[in-house]
From Swiss-Prot:
GO molecular function per UniProt: glutamate dehydrogenase (NADP+) activity
Amino acids binding NADP(+): 207, 238
Pfam families, per database record: ELFV_dehydrog, ELFV_dehydrog_N
Catalytic activity: L-glutamate + NADP(+) + H2O = 2-oxoglutarate + NH4(+) + NADPH + H(+)
Disulfide bonds: none
Gene name tied to this protein: gdhA
Name of the protein: NADP-specific glutamate dehydrogenase
Binding locations of substrate: 88, 109, 112, 163, 375
UniProt family annotation: Belongs to the Glu/Leu/Phe/Val dehydrogenases family.
GO biological process, one term: glutamate biosynthetic process
Site (Important for catalysis): 164
Organism: Psychrobacter sp. (strain TAD1)
Length: 448
């Protein structure tokens, strides 16, 4: 079956899952030159197999709030592909979570994980539980209840979840404690743990730092440096603040961070003191707008960062945060590089627009793979009961991000997607990730 026919089949079968369809189409369109060059992929229906998860688990999560009321949420775990290793992907707690969102994230995770070159498959999970406004006791009770259900489907050799939006170190700790209580095993079943009980140094920083390392390689490919470049960052969570931190440390001028209520614009640029203040502010769930009272700058209520002149954008908030109108603003304001810190933060129309205007674009599956790369290193450390230093992990991370950049650029050129120095990282990354998984599926026959 041709790629176009496969897309039609997905659209018909999952018409009610727009995020998933968007992710599938983005990969399908860009891998066509590779797919056409390998008839064995079509013969064994590799693409059709990859768009269907191995399995999807759904479950009810009952928990008790501080008023003694029983609350009910939905939970899911999507085990998409274990062709390259155990299922690996985060858990997201957010009211927008549904099967479509988790399937899009799990599908992307297959190729992101493949790009790292590490032996991990792709999966994703989460719940429509909203941590905002909940007390620590309520979050703890929910995490315990969630893991009571999830523990049936995960273990260190089959499926290893991690954190994502709404799931940080606190939530991972609660879930890990419940897993140990239920199974009487202390294993590497979940990553993002505290360093004192099996976690890896640098896991917190990895996604944001990794995105900036990828950006450095993009700039170097164009004979440019990050020094003095003006950067727009969206979001104010873990990825956003660590991307801002690393960019600042190596000489960029980070002008913005944002949340759902608006954007901080600091024309002087962030520094370490300001970033440390922002980390505390977000950890304590206090308003981002307070920044202006402490450090000055401008609070742009109900606005995104994209109307500000800059060289680089790192969207790190959530999926589809940049639409076509935002993309036009970015181009009009001089942005030449876009690096996705979040998963699929650009709509399909926005991607088409920036590529048409030759903006250098790094898709999330390549640019934000640093988080899962260090998660895999945590799994390795757990298996041999040894820790690596921050410097050792950072060196590995820089090497992994360089390899992802270089392999994506080489694939772009090999399949005719590079034009007068403009590297099509989206096509390149999709082809590299897809080929690694597809070759494994061909080797396995029809059993995987």
């Amino acid at each position: 079956m041709s790629i176009s026919k496969a897309i039609e089949k997905v659209e018909a079968r999952y018409a009610h899952q727009p995020e998933f369809i968007q992710a599938v189409k983005e990969v399908a369109i860009t891998i066509k030159p590779l797919y056409d060059a390998h008839p064995e992929y079509d013969k064994l229906k590799v693409f059709e197999r990859l768009v269907e998860p191995d399995r999807v688990f759904g479950f009810r999560v009952n928990w008790e709030d501080d008023n003694g009321e029983i609350q009910i949420n939905r939970g899911w775990r999507v085990q998409f592909s274990n062709a390259l290793g155990p299922y690996k992907g985060g858990l997201r707690f957010h009211p927008t979570v549904n099967q479509s969102v988790l399937k899009f994230l799990g599908f992307e995770q297959i190729f992101k994980n493949a790009l790292t070159g590490l032996p991990i498959g792709g999966g994703k999970g989460g719940s429509d539980f909203d941590p905002k406004g909940k007390t620590d006791s309520e979050i703890r009770r929910f995490c315990y209840a969630f893991m009571r259900e999830l523990h049936h489907y995960v273990n260190k050799d089959m499926d290893v979840p991690a954190g994502d939006i709404g799931v940080g170190g606190r939530e991972v700790s609660y879930m890990f404690a419940m897993y140990k209580n239920l199974t009487r095993e202390s294993t590497g079943v979940i990553t993002g743990k505290g360093v004192g009980f099996g976690g890896s140094l640098m896991r917190t920083e990895a996604t944001g730092y990794g995105a900036v390392y990828f950006l450095q390689n993009m700039l170097a490919a164009q004979n440019e440096s990050i020094e003095g470049k003006k950067v727009l960052v969206s979001g104010a969570g873990n990825v956003s603040l660590h991307a801002a931190e690393k960019a600042t440390l190596i000489g960029a001028i980070v002008l913005t961070v944002s949340d759902s209520k608006g954007t901080i614009y600091d024309a002087k640029g962030l520094n370490q003191e300001k970033i440390d203040w922002l980390k505390v502010q977000k950890d304590q769930h206090k308003p981002l707008a307070d920044y202006v009272e402490v450090f000055g700058g401008e609070w742009m209520a109900d606005q995104k960062p994209w109307s500000i002149k800059a060289d680089i954008a790192i969207p790190s908030a959530t999926q589809n945060e940049i639409n076509e109108e935002d993309a036009k603003l970015l181009v009009d304001n001089g942005v030449k590089y876009i690096v996705e810190g979040a998963n699929m933060p650009l709509t399909a129309e926005a991607i088409d627009y920036i590529r048409l205007h030759r903006v250098h674009y790094a898709p999330g599956k390549a640019a934000n793979a640093g988080g899962v790369a260090v998660s895999a290193l945590e799994m390795s450390q757990n298996s041999v009961r040894q820790y690596q230093t921050f410097e050792q992990v950072d060196e590995r991370l820089q090497g992994i991000m360089k390899d992802i950049h270089d392999s994506s650029a080489q694939a772009s050129e090999m399949y005719g997607q590079t034009d007068e120095g403009y590297i099509d990282y989206m096509s390149g990354a999709n082809m590299v990730g897809f080929k690694r998984v597809a070759d494994a599926l061909v080797a396995f026959g029809i059993l995987n």
